[in-house]
Every structure is written in structure tokens, then in C-alpha cells.
Amino acid sequence: MRDGKELKPCLSGRGVTKVFGFGDAKTVAVDHVDFDFHEGEFVSIVGESGSGKTTLSKMLLGLISVTEGEIDFQGKPRDISNGKKKKEYWKGIQAIFQDPFASLNPRMTVEETIREPLELSGKVKKGELSDETDRIMEMVGIDERLRYAYPHELDGGRRQRVGIGRALALDPAFVVCDEPVSALDVSIQAQVLNLLQDLQEKSGVTYMFVTHDLSVVKHISDNICVMYLGQLVETTTSKELFDRPLHPYTKALLSAIPSVDIHHQKQRIILKGEIVSPIEPKPGCRFAARCPYATEKCHQPQELREVSKDHFVSCCRVEEINS
């Protein structure tokens, strides 16, 4: 719901699971995740390394297969069963990667990089390619004088602008942003985040922003989903998550955000215990081994349930802990 209007799901998933390996060495990277990313939303996926954020992103992009579950795109079951259908799917869903230097072809100029998806898609007439390339360069703030520059001649911020321009060239409905600012200087991070927001307001694109840094997404996200070892443990609006975190893991993440407030340091939650193995995990809460509130019933299967309006938590003791 935004401005009183019900938003349609852009990308949805039910029971989405990814298992690597076989036999007795199966690693459950993403475990029966349900989600709805609505049109025009800025949704952030946060969690530590190994939480399954990037694996989920790759499944949504069609870069790796889904072991179990269903994904719908723009209200229809996703079909990427062959190369032609996958190419058509990629016209509507694109990615902005973490390292702009590694994600750009070092032998292609700025103009060639942005022009390539326009040529391959066939959406733009040959005679209009140059004008459309100019429009996209201006849209993402790339100076005309850099048209023939190569990636190694650009700084990190400009390289990422090229990556953003390439991703948005085909006017996709959904864009996966895989830690797009983590490799940039702090001053440049703000510029890139502002650019992403401005482009979203103009185009209505849906963002899935993957990061391990909650402080980055606080002011830009509509909703935030917290992942831990392949499972969603909490999802709600950005304001609600920062004002009233309910899951013990979310509280620990928020307490780790650096602050100039000396009193904040005293509230830091230090997690103890061992991280459970994702190889053939046992039923129950994956966080139980590190949770200070864990009891026997935490080792029973958990489900992500709505504990207040639009606030979902996977914890059987959430009411007791937060009473």
C-alpha cells in the first residue's frame, strides 16, 4: 500500500529453496522463502555473509536454478526453460553488481557498454541508438566527454553509473542491486543511492537491494527483509524495523551499527555460541544456537508469521521476548 493505492506484485515467490550438493552433503543455501516485491518498491535484503542473500538474487535473476518452489513475474509463472524465454525474461529484470570494475568489459567504452543491450534487445531502431545512448548517459549523470572512455579510466562512482545505465537501458520492471555501494567511498555511496532513488521515482522500477549494512538502507528502503542462514527471520517496513525490531537476530544486527553516541555502545548485543552448519540442517530456528532466549521449543519448525500489521517474524517466543 502506497499513497492509499494497492500495489501489484512485481516479483513473487513461494517456498523458494536452493540446495547445493547431493547425498549426505547437501547445503541448504535458501530454505523455503516466501516473498512479494511490489511495483515501485525499494526492498532491502540484509544479513551476514552466508545468509543466502546472493543465492536468492541469483535465483531471481535466473542465473542458477531453483531446487524447489515457484517464482511469479508480473503476475505470471516465470518460464526460463530455454534460452529464448530466458532472454525475454532478462528484458524485464536486470542487475547492478557490487564491483563495477569487475562487472564491466575492460575492452568496451562507456558508449559501447550502454549501447550493447539496446542493440541486442531490438527494442530501439538502429537509427535511434545513438540518441537513446545519449539519453541514458545523461539520465545517470555521465559526462558526454566520457563517451569513449574505458572502465580503467573512470573512478568507482562513474563506473557504477555506467553499470546502472546498462541495467536500466531496457527499462526493466525489476532490478537486483547486489551491494552496489559497498566497494565505493562513503561520499560516493550517497551520490549513487540518491541516483537510484531519483531513477526509481521517474521510472517506477522495483529494487531489491542486497546488503549486509543496515545503516545504508535505513532511509532509502520501503521494506526490509532480514535473512539468517537461508531463512527470512523478520520482514516489515524500514521505519518499523528500526523503531521496533522484534527478532533477537535483528536486534543484534541493529546494535552493531556504529554510532557517535557513547551510550549506544553499552547496548551492543554480543552473540555467543556456534553458527549451525547449513549442511543438512535440523528442524527449528537456525538462530537458536546463538540466541540468549532459546528454549526447547525453539528447536521445533518455525514459520514466518504476522505479529502486527505488515510485521512478520519467525520466532515462537517473539511475544514473550518483547512483552
Which residues does each predicted region cover?
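Short catalytic/signature loops enriched in Gly
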Residues: 2-9, 26, 235-323
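A short, proline-enriched helix->beta-strand linker immediately N-terminal to the Walker B motif
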Residues: 169-173
